Amino acid sequence: MSPYVLTIMSFSLLLGTTMTLISNHWLTAWMGLEINTLAIIPLMTKPHHPRSMESAIKYFMIQATASMIILFSAIFNASTTNQWMTGQISNTSASFMMTIALAMKLGLAPFHFWVPEVTQGIPLLSGMLLLTWQKIAPISIFYQISPSLNMSLLMILSITSTLLGGWGGLNQTQLRKILAYSSIAHMGWMAIIIMIYPSLTILNLILYLASTITMFMVLNQSSSTKINSLSILWNKSAPNMIIITLTLLSLGGLPPLTGFMPKWLILQELINFNNIPLAMMLALSTLLNLFFYMRIIYSSTLTMFPSINNTKMQWTLYSHKTISPIPTLTIISSLLLPMTPVFITLS
């Protein structure tokens, strides 16, 4: 892809997300979502391959359908309340349709079937954008309309997402599909708390973005797309393998890593609101995700292929120095649990 085209598409992604974040009118928020969708499609089809073209078409159809429902629900709400402000949805039907449309955009179950298939068919860096950057704009709309959402509908979407996100990843061997199902489960955690404690959803999103970006960047650096390809990664790059292990455990929510913080705070808020059965179901569903994270770690560290290298380390000489964000992202995604009181105070 031409550097000029790449620059234009990257700027369009930034513009679309920014428009949605700062807009207080439904039309400009919808325009931002559309710019986001149209900007990422050329990046998804950068290797001109039938699989990537198929994934881009699937993504476009789902996003176009969701955008159509968003626009229709905004017009329907305006026709009954004479309000175009994003934070004001007083019509029950419009709120229901808006929730369904945003669930489609985020990949919440039962509208999640496109997420693993699209992620598997595109390159790793495009998959990283799909599972991270493209979540920001829809969640910002969720945040703005959180007082008008239907709690029962959100509970159904959240529980279904956390359960199916865990079950779907159990029999996967492709790392991109595993991260896609992980994204579905994490979106369920964010959706369940959006009405009760919206600021906690933003905290969860930031930590999820840091962990997922770290995983994708390390996998892209090591050219790993399957679980069995990680078996030889320890001999090629031990630091990358350590980063993958820490990040996966953090995504699974194990203490004392950063990923434990949002799950702990969400369960605490649910218990405070007497939603103990819901908190138990979410906690149990986390075990499904933790199982396939541990399966990756087991396959990559405890079942390594015999090393034919006689030295303790394979030395790799680089002709130029590069500044990588991976160390910083690793610290954010793994070592921020002691900062929990600070985040509670700020939120």
Swiss-Prot record:
GO terms for biological process: mitochondrial electron transport, NADH to ubiquinone. It is found in: Mitochondrion inner membrane. One of its GO terms (cellular component) is mitochondrial inner membrane. Belongs to the complex I subunit 2 family. Coiled coil: none annotated. The keyword Ribonucleoprotein does not apply. InterPro entries: Complex_I_Subunit_2 (IPR050175), NADH_DH_su2_C (IPR010933), NADH_UbQ_OxRdtase_chain2 (IPR003917), ND/Mrp_TM (IPR001750). This is NADH-ubiquinone oxidoreductase chain 2. The gene is MT-ND2. One of its GO terms (molecular function) is NADH dehydrogenase (ubiquinone) activity. The chain crosses the membrane at residues 2-22, 25-45, 56-76, 96-116, 122-142, 149-169, 178-197, 202-219, 241-261, 278-298, 326-346. It comes from the Eukaryota. Its main location: mitochondrion. Its EC number is 7.1.1.2.
